[in-house]
């Protein structure tokens, strides 16, 4: 019996991503590269503890002109948690979606909310079909969040600028957590832990993601 990936070495563990037994070398080299690893895979979760994302060059981070202050995040804590959960759910419900697709969806959403701020609305749907699906789902859920807020309070509390700021924060978190693998979902793992109900998770430190 040989590894289901390389067909050469002896398999040492079961891989839920390929639904077969694989060797430890292929597990390490093909993880989130050619294999779409389930987020609950024990070997993937263990590898997360040793991930070392490349340092972020602040000059390469998009939307630097949008200031995301700790005060804004504190005042919109409920909105941020909602958006984080909405992005995670939309991506996890989209078969084949990885962090890079979420990055495109977030950029499209940010462009759309930028246009709302300018007074000239433009729906910036990504051309990438996976990213477009995530974009549409988050856009729909955000509209529902604001509708329910108006019904419950009688006023429109959440501004377009608030949504924009929270989206930019999530975009910076994606840049911080993305491990660069083609099928990587380290950012989605973080979102699921922070905003998906994991009892052991702690939210990301805002100060580390706020650009000077």
Map each language-model feature to its residues.
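N-terminal cysteine/histidine-rich coordination modules
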Residues: 1-56
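Long, charged interaction segments in nuclear RNA/chromatin-associated proteins
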Residues: 36, 40-212
């Amino acid at each position: 019996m040989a590894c289901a990936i390389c067909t050469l070495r002896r398999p040492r563990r079961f891989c839920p991503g390929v639904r077969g037994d694989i060797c430890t070398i292929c597990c390490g080299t093909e993880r989130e590269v050619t294999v779409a690893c389930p987020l609950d895979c024990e070997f993937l979760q263990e590898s997360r503890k040793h991930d070392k994302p490349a340092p972020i060059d602040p000059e390469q981070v998009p939307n630097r002109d949008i200031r995301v202050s700790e005060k804004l995040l504190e005042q919109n804590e409920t909105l941020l948690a909602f958006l984080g959960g909405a992005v995670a759910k939309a991506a996890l419900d989209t078969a084949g979606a990885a962090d890079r697709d979420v990055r495109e969806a977030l950029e499209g959403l940010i462009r759309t909310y930028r246009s709302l701020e300018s007074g000239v609305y433009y729906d910036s749907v990504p051309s990438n079909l996976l990213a477009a699906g995530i974009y549409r789902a988050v856009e729909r859920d955000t509209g529902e969040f604001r509708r329910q807020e108006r019904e419950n309070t009688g006023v429109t509390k959440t501004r377009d600028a608030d949504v924009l700021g929270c989206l930019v924060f999530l975009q910076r978190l994606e840049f911080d957590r993305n491990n660069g693998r083609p099928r990587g979902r380290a950012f989605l793992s973080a979102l699921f832990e922070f905003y998906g109900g994991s009892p052991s998770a702690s939210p990301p430190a805002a100060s580390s993601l706020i650009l000077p």
